A protein has these predicted regions:
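Positively charged n-region of N-terminal signal peptides that target proteins for export
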Residues: 1-4
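Hydrophobic positions within alpha-helical membrane elements
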Residues: 7-8, 69
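A periodicity- and composition-biased signal for non-globular, repetitive helical segments
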Residues: 8-9, 79
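Hydrophobic h-region of N-terminal signal peptides that target proteins for export
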Residues: 9-18
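Cyclophilin-like peptidyl-prolyl cis-trans isomerases
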Residues: 17-223
């Protein structure tokens, strides 16, 4: 009896600990809300996003780079008060994040990654991120990426790339630190907007509000 109770308690504590680790961030736009789940195996990127969301850093920044069947990108602090048609994408926060590139985190449709410049360490921007829209990939394309990055895709990863799509050529080059779990229809609406020659939407698309999603309390009991 005591042993069974101990096991039950340990299982309960494990479930509580697991629930506490799940972090979600919401982005409100005029087209609707996007909810991202942040990965725990990229802790520095996760914690950076948490910090910026808590400080309201992203509020009023724009999705300044939109390329259909590729990505939508935002987070440039210079975009908050940018003039129409101004080139964006060079604004920064003053630091980089060490690369946390994992073979299990791929650029499938809905993946959230951090932008970066051409630095050899593949360190990420401290603030600019992107969401993958992508397109379906072929086995030949995936084979080519495997040879380039020196890592094999799992059968599940291949299936997702071939059916749902993504941007596999980015794998191994950028840190993927999350996944959109709600609002890909919103991402698609943003991706469909008209853009200028610099891939900036001709009509500003702002992140009205970026916040941590409050965890709902769950109660266990006998009913």
């Amino acid at each position: 009896m005591k042993k069974s109770l101990l096991i039950a308690c340990l299982c309960f504590l494990g479930m509580v600990a697991y629930a506490q680790k799940e972090t979600k961030v919401s982005i409100e736009t005029e087209y609707g809300k996007i909810v991202m789940l942040l990965y725990n195996n990229t802790p520095q990127h996760r914690d950076n996003m948490i910090k910026l969301a808590k400080s309201h850093f992203y509020d009023s920044t724009l999705f300044h780079r939109v390329i259909p069947n590729f990505v939508i990108q935002g987070g440039d602090p210079q975009s908050k008060h940018a003039q129409p048609g101004a080139m964006l994408g060079n604004g920064e926060i003053g630091y980089r994040i060490p690369a946390e590139i994992n073979t299990e985190d791929c650029h499938i449709r809905g993946a959230v990654g951090m932008a970066r410049d051409g630095n050899p360490k593949k360190e990420s921007s401290g603030c600019q991120f992107y969401i993958v829209t992508g397109k379906p990939a072929t086995d030949a394309e995936l084979d080519n990426v495997e040879r380039t990055r020196g890592a094999k895709y799992t059968a599940a990863q291949r299936e997702i790339y071939k059916t749902q799509g993504g941007t596999p050529h980015l794998d191994g080059g950028y840190t993927v630190f999350g996944q959109v779990i709600e609002g890909m229809d919103v991402v698609d609406k943003i991706s469909a907007q008209a853009c200028d020659q610099n891939n900036r939407p001709t009509k500003d698309i702002a992140m009205i509000k970026v916040r941590l999603v409050k965890k709902k309390k769950k109660f266990l009991g006998i009913f």
